[in-house]
Amino acid sequence: MAAAAPLAMAAPAPTVKLGIDLFSLRSQNWTPFQLLDYSAKLAAKVVHFSEIRFIGSLEPENLRSVRRYAEERGIEIEIGMRSICPTSKMFDAKAGTAEEQIGRMLDSATLAGSRIVRAVLGSSEDRRPGPIEKHIESTIKVLRNVRAKAQDHNLKIAIENHSGDMQAHELKQLIEESGKDFVGACLDSGNPLWTLEDPHLTLETLHPYVLTSHVRDSSVWRVPEGAAVSWVRMGQGNVAIDEYCRKYAELCPGRALSMESIVTNPRVFAFRDPKFWEAYRDVPAWSFARFLEIADRGQPRAAEPRPANPEAGRQREREDLEASVEYTRKLLGL
């Protein structure tokens, strides 16, 4: 008598939560409830309100309403803010001191049901005239000042490697010196290239500190001035994003892998000009060599044609995100 066929094994549970960073929908001008409805249609488990503008306001009743709406749809909320570094060119002093701004966000995160507050130091502009170390020190001081309040709220602050401000080793230093008991990383896969860094090195360095993430693909290639970088839809780049996502799922189980869809025209990094290096004097040669290996494998990408009108731009923005979400879901079996 033939043996009975074995029962089909249950599929393994997803090791990461598929999320959407609402910067992906920055041009839609939707309410937080419309953003949640759209995210639910894409089967997102986490919605990352990376800036205050996306959640509408920090009024307690609004935050409670958004929380209820998300919970009814089985969605986890993360909230965030922009610069918390008083010496950064991005910092908005009109909104109060950095400590006051973080304090408001910690209160808001509690009301909204977010386990973290995402924040940034600044951007690549803070590397000029530099040094970036002074801004790191400024941010560390602020974070130490809010440690007690963060711990009282049982919340953590996720600092992003943002817009070319810090390489992985610099963000690691910021986290360690601020206090890794309440500060971690919002790991972005596209921004490392704006600091001449291999995104895989960024992941290797920061994965022990990851609280949440932004993911998108990138295309990098050599140009006469140095290298060019474009952010692209998932699967269209040359940074081995499939391997990156699988590695993230292995190293950061249970964390959100949130799509931050941004499709850009090429940005040139003119590293053949000696003046360029005034902003990047601390970049290790061995790390830069890894970046060059990626660029050497790349092929030039033509600039994307501009949308014919704002509505066409909004439609393309949605199409870019939907394509990246679908690609990533299939890749990881989410």
Give residue ranges: language-model regions.
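Mobile, glycine- and charge-enriched loop segments
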Residues: 12-29, 67, 71
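Alpha-helix N-cap and loop-to-helix initiation/capping positions
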Residues: 34, 57-65, 93-101, 130-141, ...
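Histidine-acidic metal/acid-base catalytic patches
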Residues: 3-6, 11-17, 33-35, 40, ...
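Active-site acidic/histidine proton-transfer and metal-coordination neighborhood
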Residues: 3-14, 69-77, 88-184
